[in-house]
Amino acid sequence: MERIVTPAEMFEDGNSELSLRPQKINEYIGQDKVKERLNIFIKAAKNRKEALDHVLLYGPPGLGKTTLANIIAKEMTGDLKITSGPAIERAGDLAAILTTLKDYDVLFIDEIHRLNRSVEEILYPAMEDYALDIVIGKGAAAKSIRLDLPKFTLIGATTRIGMLTSPLRDRFGVLCAMEYYDENQLKEIVIRSAAVFGCKITEEGALEIASRSRGTPRIANRLLKRVRDYSEVKSNTVISLKEAREALELLEVDNQGFDKVDNKILEAIIDNFNGGPVGIETLSYFIGEELGTVEDVYEPYLLQKGFIVRTPRGRIASDKAYKHLGRVNNKNNNSNKGQTSFFK
């Protein structure tokens, strides 16, 4: 069973996310620095009648990378083609996609860090020269021909920028770090989404949902849908603070936005490893989750909120974690010193 607070896309998110996505960059809430830069680059490219330079969006999942790609395509008056690194298994698969593009189209590759090397190398001339090198024949009779491609924009999205090879990363002209949203930004998103859903919500109710949404719009919208269900069944016409709080408690999402898995991680570090340090592989094994899942999904938010600290020797529970679980920290382990951002 998937967690309701997972930032990864769930099956139920698909259709609702499409209806909730803003269509213009000035409608997009949050990520102000990213928006400002992209707005300038888009206007400059349109004034010169050129394709926008290739864009790399990196950061935790659920923060709006696909939405931004859709907005960029609309602003550039092109079509958006969406695929992912794991879906492109062979160089021929990518070549087939590239040859269907038109001028100013946007090719969005999610999880671009998972492209295999042979596929990645096809991208190099496509990104630099808008060209596709194809080898015809085999052995001594083989020859290479170059096909011209339209002036397109590649947008890559990744949660693991460190896993990108330098040659690929260096070919992106625009790099944008996506950051977690603050509660006021998420409150705006919840109020906007409620209007799209056709339900009424008070500012206090929206803020309560926002405060438990882990800084992630996807989670905020998902929680809003479940709170709406609760409110409708209880015959309430407006989602108030009371209804929002009751529904979220029923969903077992606490006031930090943590669920059982998050608290299990904190409990493991404190109760089973004496507050740490503990290696991420050991911790992953202990809680029964894959290493990549812990690094990509669970750890970033705990780091961002300052509940765990990443040190050269492993993960340490901070004083906030002890207080959250009602434990007393008797260790002098400098638990508030170390790396508290996953993307530094």
UniProtKB/Swiss-Prot annotation:
It is an enzyme of class 3 (hydrolase). Residues 255-344 are annotated as: Head domain (RuvB-H). Residues 182-252 are annotated as: Small ATPAse domain (RuvB-S). One of its GO terms (cellular component) is Holliday junction resolvase complex. Keywords: ATP-binding, Cytoplasm, DNA damage, DNA recombination, DNA repair, DNA-binding, Hydrolase, Nucleotide-binding. InterPro entries: AAA+_ATPase, AAA_lid_4, DNA_helicase_Holl-junc_RuvB, P-loop_NTPase, RuvB-like_N, RuvB_C, WH-like_DNA-bd_sf, WH_DNA-bd_sf. Residues 1-181 are annotated as: Large ATPase domain (RuvB-L). It is found in: Cytoplasm. Its main location: cytoplasm. It catalyses: ATP + H2O = ADP + phosphate + H(+). Homohexamer. Forms an RuvA(8)-RuvB(12)-Holliday junction (HJ) complex. HJ DNA is sandwiched between 2 RuvA tetramers; dsDNA enters through RuvA and exits via RuvB. An RuvB hexamer assembles on each DNA strand where it exits the tetramer. Each RuvB hexamer is contacted by two RuvA subunits (via domain III) on 2 adjacent RuvB subunits; this complex drives branch migration. In the full resolvosome a probable DNA-RuvA(4)-RuvB(12)-RuvC(2) complex forms which resolves the HJ. The RuvA-RuvB-RuvC complex processes Holliday junction (HJ) DNA during genetic recombination and DNA repair, while the RuvA-RuvB complex plays an important role in the rescue of blocked DNA replication forks via replication fork reversal (RFR). RuvA specifically binds to HJ cruciform DNA, conferring on it an open structure. The RuvB hexamer acts as an ATP-dependent pump, pulling dsDNA into and through the RuvAB complex. RuvB forms 2 homohexamers on either side of HJ DNA bound by 1 or 2 RuvA tetramers; 4 subunits per hexamer contact DNA at a time. PANTHER family: HOLLIDAY JUNCTION BRANCH MIGRATION COMPLEX SUBUNIT RUVB, PTHR42848. This is Holliday junction branch migration complex subunit RuvB. It comes from Clostridium botulinum (strain Alaska E43 / Type E3). The lineage of its organism: Bacteria, Bacillati, Bacillota, Clostridia, Eubacteriales.
